[in-house]
C-alpha cells in the first residue's frame, strides 16, 4: 500500500493549498448533486449545480474547478442550463466553456470559465448540468496480475465538491460495476448500497473544500484504447459514402504477469481470463452495408452483425483475447447511402456525419478523420461542436486529374461523448459529375480509333528505302550462316561415324567393313565441301558480312584440316591391323594425330558458338 500512502500525501497537500485560495465571486451553490459512473474505463461525472447570486453585482461567468490530476485527463466537458424539475426537466443548449487564467491560483487545480446565457443578477438562481468525461483516472492496482486474478482498479476523488464558491448542500454517488469492493474511504454519512457508494449530504462547505477519497474495486470493463485511429470518409456523388477505419488497439488494464495458457482460458474463460476482453461492439448507422472486418493476415470471420431499422451492430472479435499490455491491429469498413448523410443548403452541399469511432466505450489517444470530397469541390469549410486541428490535403485516385480535396481533422484524447455530428460544407458543380464518365468514353473512343488506324494503315517500311534493303541483306546473311552451320554440323557427324568404324574394327577385326565405311565417309565429305564453296562466295559479296566472313573461312579451313587428320588416323589404324601390329603399337603411332584432332574439334566448336551468337 506504499502507492496509496503517496497518493494520500499528495491529496493532503492539495487540500492545504486550496484552503489558502480566495473565492471567485459572491456566487453560492445552494445545492450540488454529483454522480460518478465508473462502470467502464471512462469516469463520467454528471453534476447538477444550483447557482445563487448572493452579491450585489451581476455575474456573467461561472468557474468550474478540478484537481490537477483530473484536469490533465479531462477528455470531454459540457455545461448547459436546465429548466423545470423531475420529468418536466429539460436541458438547453450547451454554454461556451474555456480554460480560465490560472493567475493567483495554485498549480494543483484546473479552472474552466463558463459564459452564462445572461448575467445573473442579485438574488437570481440558475441550474447548470455539467457533464465531464475523464480518461486514465481508473488506475490498475495492482499494475500486474496473472491470468487467473481479478482486475482491480483505483479511483481517486473528493467526497466534497471542489469549487471556488461556498456550497450549502452537496452529495456524491459513485456507480460501480458491481458490488465487489476491496476498500473505500469512509467519512460521516458514507453509505454502500449494492454497487453504489454514497457520500453526504454535507452542509455549509467553504469554498475549495476538499476531502480526498480512494475507492478500490473490481472492474470487468474492456480497457480498450486506440493508440491511433484513422477514419477515412470518402464521398461519391454516385450514391455512396465509403468509411474505412484503421485501428491500433491496446489493452490498458493491468498487465499480464506470467505465461498465457490457451487451454485454461478455453476451459474456464471467466475465472481464467477475467481481465481480458474478447470482443468489441461497434454501433454503425442503420443502413450500413458492404461491411468488412480484417487485419494484416486477411478477413476475420469471427465477427457477427445484427441490424434493424434503428442501428447496425457489428460484434468485433479479434483473433486472440487481449490481456493487459497486448495489442491488435485491424480495419473495419462499410458503405453508407449518400441520401442519409449528404444535404444541400444555401447553394452548398454539406456532409453531416459522426466524428468519433462507432466502437462503444473506446478511448482514442489520437484520432485522424480524413474526409475525401469529390474532385472539383471548392469553398470548403467545416463545423465541429468542439475544437479540432484542421488541415487540407490532395488525394489522387482513379481517373483524377487535379486530385480530390481531403479535409483532415485531428483530436487527441477522444471518448464516445465526442461521437457527435460534424458538417463539411463545399460547393460542387453537377458538370463535374460527368468528367470521369466522359474521360472513360474518350479513352475507349481513342483506343477504338487507334485500332482502326493500325489495322487499315500500311505502316511497313518502304521496299526501296536503304534501311529496308539493308534489312533484307542482313536476313540473307543470317540465312547463309545457318546453312554453313548446318553443313559443318553434318561434317562433324560424318567424322563421328568414321571414328565409330575404327571402334568397330578394334572390336571385330573386320578390315573390309572399316574400309567400306571409309569410302562412304570420304564421298559424303566431298559432297558437303562442294556445298560450302558457293556459300562462302555469297557471304564475301555482302559488305554487311565483312566482319563475319573471316570467321566462317577459318571454320571451313579448320574443318578441312580436321578431315585430313581423321583420314590419316584411319589409314594408320587400318594398316596396323593389316600388318597385325599390337594395339599398343597402333595407339603409339596415332597418339600425336589424336591430340591434334581433339584440338581442332574444340576450335571448330568455339567458332560454331561464335556464329550462333550472331
From Swiss-Prot:
Positions in the Cytoplasmic compartment: 454-614
Segments crossing the lipid bilayer: 433-453
GO cellular component terms, A-Z: endoplasmic reticulum; endoplasmic reticulum membrane; mitochondrion
Cross-link Glycyl lysine isopeptide (Lys-Gly) (interchain with G-Cter in ubiquitin): where in chain: 311
Glycan attachment positions: 94, 299, 352
Chief place of localization: endoplasmic reticulum
Main function: Subunit of the oligosaccharyl transferase (OST) complex that catalyzes the initial transfer of a defined glycan (Glc(3)Man(9)GlcNAc(2) in eukaryotes) from the lipid carrier dolichol-pyrophosphate to an asparagine residue within an Asn-X-Ser/Thr consensus motif in nascent polypeptide chains, the first step in protein N-glycosylation. N-glycosylation occurs cotranslationally and the complex associates with the Sec61 complex at the channel-forming translocon complex that mediates protein translocation across the endoplasmic reticulum (ER). All subunits are required for a maximal enzyme activity.
PANTHER family registered for this protein in UniProt: DOLICHYL-DIPHOSPHOOLIGOSACCHARIDE--PROTEIN GLYCOSYLTRANSFERASE SUBUNIT 1, RIBOPHORIN I
Pathway, per record: Protein modification; protein glycosylation
Record family assignment: Belongs to the OST1 family.
Membrane topology, as annotated: Single-pass type I membrane protein
Cell location: Endoplasmic reticulum membrane
Keywords of this entry: Endoplasmic reticulum, Glycoprotein, Isopeptide bond, Membrane, Signal, Transmembrane, Transmembrane helix, Ubl conjugation
Designated name of the protein: Dolichyl-diphosphooligosaccharide--protein glycosyltransferase subunit 1A
Signal peptide: 1-25
Organism per entry: Arabidopsis thaliana
Gene Ontology BP term (one): protein N-linked glycosylation
InterPro entries registered for this protein in UniProt: Ribophorin_I
Topology, Lumenal side: 26-432
Subunit structure: Component of the oligosaccharyltransferase (OST) complex.
